[in-house]
Amino acid sequence: MVRKPVVATISKGGYLQGNMSGRLPSMGDQEPPGQEKVVLKKKITLLRGVSIIIGTVIGSGIFISPKGILQNTGSVGMSLVFWSACGVLSLFGALSYAELGTSIKKSGGHYTYILEVFGPLLAFVRVWVELLVIRPGATAVISLAFGRYILEPFFIQCEIPELAIKLVTAVGITVVMVLNSTSVSWSARIQIFLTFCKLTAILIIIVPGVIQLIKGQTHHFKDAFSGRDTSLMGLPLAFYYGMYAYAGWFYLNFITEEVDNPEKTIPLAICISMAIITVGYVLTNVAYFTTISAEELLQSSAVAVTFSERLLGKFSLAVPIFVALSCFGSMNGGVFAVSRLFYVASREGHLPEILSMIHVHKHTPLPAVIVLHPLTMVMLFSGDLYSLLNFLSFARWLFMGLAVAGLIYLRYKRPDMHRPFKVPLFIPALFSFTCLFMVVLSLYSDPFSTGVGFLITLTGVPAYYLFIVWDKKPKWFRRLSDRITRTLQIILEVVPEDSKEL
């Protein structure tokens, strides 16, 4: 059976079409009547959607080192203003994605919207960088935080060995991959539990902070807008840190096809999640300042631990566990969502065919999940992991800005397009400008890293013409590619998705 992708792909087909019995039939076989289709099921309810957004946005930063904004604003009051403003701007981006997700009912997020508006080249470059660098690197970073804080209660009196951190991290990554390969339902249920843990951890900080306010502990808020002298360059950097802290609201759009009743669920999940996150972030910072001065917060290596040691006594030992669970939730949500990006890109012919196949029994995009495992392990044991991510930090904002600018373009080019959820045009316009500002700021503040990242991103252009456009590849290459695909199908028990209405 030969697949016909949107554009020429590495292999011209030759994979095997399977069925729910796990058998790979011959061309003459008939599918039993009433047999369940091999597709990704619509199992993402409103609660699960909310848990995915909250679970991926809230990582370790708010608990460990929320000082980037304070350091660059110079005052308690201005830092709280920036936390609130960045929450509102992130909500604008999320609302823009809600319109895109309900108008273009396909999974894939940025990739799908860029493909729809700007064509295959830019879309391929987006998924190229995401697959090879950004997602493995980001997963490794949040996983390292998980490994460090899960071990911290066992190494109170001494430094945690780096090898131990990486080994525990590797175990955590493997558990996440296995979980997402095994069951969509269980991944979503565990994500709900981990989101509950995150919110519990935030409440453990907020409630004592509110009690402190009731007791009159407001001396750190006196002259809240006076403090250290801050250069004008500091304010854009504070804005950059704030927007980065809210990043992750777009992940629900990566799994649009699995969302139950997306026209209602996506906008509701986005609004509920962003409201909870913004209020939670602001109140957590307010709680910190009821007990910790601005100077102490800037010097602390783990703000939540410092806060809990002063107010909660021995209960502060639980904070590292909550941070580890928070990191695990970010790992799980990120892998769950981004695997669908690779799945959709493969379905469009931009990645190897095997990545668009589904397990015949578990109905999970197994190859698209496990492809992240070796790439993440390489990143985990790489010495320049953080530098590599810094090189490519601008790319996220560039492609998000393009996707939201595409919304404005579609308003004028396709005015009759069905839009169940529609936002005022100033919202995507303001957010697109915000993304442009973030890219320019990256270039201005660190031109070398941004330049290197831009060059890495540009490698996607020759890769596109070599792997996608060039369709006169040697026959031996095609045969080898098809043989590898068929072998992996048999080993992994995966088949192409049955056709379905989107």
Curated annotation (Swiss-Prot):
Q: Which UniProt keywords apply?
A: Amino-acid transport, Cell membrane, Cell projection, Disulfide bond, Membrane, Phosphoprotein, Transmembrane, Transmembrane helix, Transport, Ubl conjugation
Please give the tissue specificity annotation from the record for this chain: Expressed in cornea, lens, and retina (at protein level), namely in the corneal epithelium, lens epithelium and cortical fiber cells.
Residues on Cytoplasmic side: 1-43, 96-101, 117-130, 180-193, 256-265, 339-364, 409-422, 471-502
Origin organism is Mus musculus
Query: Pfam families, alphabetically?
Result: AA_permease_2 (PF13520)
* Induction behaviour: Induced by diethyl maleate. Up-regulated by lipopolysaccharide (LPS) and oxygen.
Residues reported to bind L-glutamate: R135, Y244
Q: Of which family is this protein a member?
A: Belongs to the amino acid-polyamine-organocation (APC) superfamily. L-type amino acid transporter (LAT) (TC 2.A.3.8) family.
Swiss-Prot/TrEMBL catalytic activity: L-cystine(out) + L-glutamate(in) = L-cystine(in) + L-glutamate(out); an L-alpha-amino acid(in) + L-kynurenine(out) = an L-alpha-amino acid(out) + L-kynurenine(in); N-acetyl-L-cysteine(out) + L-glutamate(in) = N-acetyl-L-cysteine(in) + L-glutamate(out)
GO CC list: apical part of cell; astrocyte projection; brush border membrane; cell surface; membrane; microvillus membrane; plasma membrane
The portions of this protein that span the membrane are 44-64, 75-95, 131-150, 164-179, 194-210, 235-255, 266-286, 318-338, 365-385, 388-408, 423-443, 450-470
Q: Which residues form a coiled coil?
A: none
Q: Which PANTHER family match?
A: AMINO ACID TRANSPORTER (PTHR11785), CYSTINE_GLUTAMATE TRANSPORTER (PTHR11785:SF323)
Q: Give the quaternary structure.
A: Disulfide-linked heterodimer with the amino acid transport protein SLC3A2/4F2hc; this interaction mediates cell membrane localization.
* InterPro entries registered for this protein in UniProt: AA/rel_permease1, AminoAcid_Transporter, L_AA_transporter
What is the protein name stated in its UniProt record?
Cystine/glutamate transporter
Q: Tell me which residues bear Phosphoserine.
A: S26
Compartments, record wording: Cell membrane; Cell projection, Microvillus membrane
Give the gene that encodes this protein. Slc7a11
Q: Which Gene Ontology BP annotations are present?
A: adult behavior; brain development; cellular response to oxidative stress; cellular response to stress; dipeptide import across plasma membrane; glutathione metabolic process; glutathione transmembrane transport; intracellular glutamate homeostasis
The residues exposed to the Extracellular compartment are: 65-74, 151-163, 211-234, 287-317, 386-387, 444-449
Q: Give GO terms: molecular function aspect only.
A: cystine:glutamate antiporter activity; L-kynurenine transmembrane transporter activity
Q: What is the lineage of its organism?
A: Eukaryota, Metazoa, Chordata, Craniata, Vertebrata
